[in-house]
């Protein structure tokens, strides 16, 4: 079962120093390097792209924004296009890691709904283009929990979910958002006392032995294989999960 919670937005952006108009790696080497979340694209599409453009796609994936950021910051890899979540775009802009886009070269931007333009993480729409939007929710196995899960606070209640049973996202932004909602606070609060309270709740959840693991893509397999009672994951993946289990 799934309970819908908060929305997420993934955004395409170009790394500074990689593609510069027609002078980037795709133009000079015939290869475009893309860094994206796992399970987000059908790689068969890359063959069609190569047939139409003559440019080969070098495609790599990551499991969290933080893992992506660390790899990019190390300077050990070069990518042309990355697709992080909204909040990470702000950080990359602030640190000068993204190039401004030439929207004359992106005609399909005209098809992006107005509500997804000029977002707070890129208010002037200079560095990014929305790629996908969706919702995140609580997914649980009714045969493995003590009582039905009906609210966010249940993920922190041992009497409801048991021990070693809950899968939490392996990134601070989403974990703190979940805890804030469990406490009845806005997920975007800037109140230091509320954020501290959320962090304390997450620490207690771990100390109480409720959390089985902090993971990302592994949530799909663990829930499908009945390895965990509950997890927080993407609503679209839930539809696939119920087909498999």
What are these regions (language model features)?
Residues 20, 37, 85, 104, ...:
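Conserved residues at the C-terminal ends of beta-strands
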């Amino acid at each position: 079962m799934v309970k819908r919670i908060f929305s997420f937005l993934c955004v395409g952006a170009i790394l500074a120093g990689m593609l510069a108009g027609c002078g980037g790696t795709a133009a000079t080497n015939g290869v475009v390097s893309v860094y994206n979340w796992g399970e987000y694209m059908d790689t068969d599409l890359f063959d069609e792209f190569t047939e139409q453009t003559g440019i080969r796609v070098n495609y790599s994936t990551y499991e969290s924004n933080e893992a992506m950021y660390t790899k990019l910051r190390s300077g050990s890899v070069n990518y042309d296009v990355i697709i992080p979540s909204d909040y990470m775009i702000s950080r990359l802009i602030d640190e000068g890691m993204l190039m401004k886009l030439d929207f004359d070269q992106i005609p399909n931007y005209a098809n992006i709904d107005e509500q997804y333009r000029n977002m707070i993480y890129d208010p002037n729409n200079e560095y990014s283009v929305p790629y996908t939007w969706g919702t995140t929710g609580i997914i649980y196995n009714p045969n493995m929990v003590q009582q039905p899960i009906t609210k966010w606070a249940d993920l922190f209640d041992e009497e409801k979910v048991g021990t070693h049973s809950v899968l939490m996202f392996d990134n601070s932004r989403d974990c703190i958002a979940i805890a804030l909602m469990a406490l009845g606070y806005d997920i975007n609060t800037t109140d230091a006392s509320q954020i501290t309270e959320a962090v304390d709740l997450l620490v207690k959840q771990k100390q109480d032995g409720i959390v089985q693991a902090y993971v990302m893509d592994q949530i799909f397999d663990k829930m499908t294989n009945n390895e965990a009672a509950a997890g927080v994951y993407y609503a679209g993946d839930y539809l696939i999960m119920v087909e498999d289990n």
